Amino acid sequence: MFILVAISIDANDNRRHVHVFYKGKRHQHSLAKIWIEANGQQCVEIAESSLSAKDNEMLVAAINRHWEFINEQVTKAFNGEKTISIDIEK
């Protein structure tokens, strides 16, 4: 349904975040930007979104459940390392 992406050029933003895209679409634009931390601590919040409230709630809950893995992948992306992806249940 969705794919979360850490974009390495965003490494200097003031808060770590992921961008949300529809999975499998060719011409994509970010549907949402979700912060995953504040001051180095887990804090998942919608920064901006064109998704429904239901989708936003589902994404925030999923990111909270898998925060350690997602944060690790963001670190790897920002360091230019290979990242891996997993399917996450709603």
Question: What function would you assign to each model-found segment?
Answer:
Residues 10-54:
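A short, structured beta-strand/loop element
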Residues 1-12:
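Betabetaalpha-Me/HNH-type nuclease active-site subdomain
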Residues 4-6, 18-20, 34-36, 59, ...:
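Generic hydrophobic secondary-structure signal
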Residues 48-89:
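Well-ordered alpha/beta subsegment
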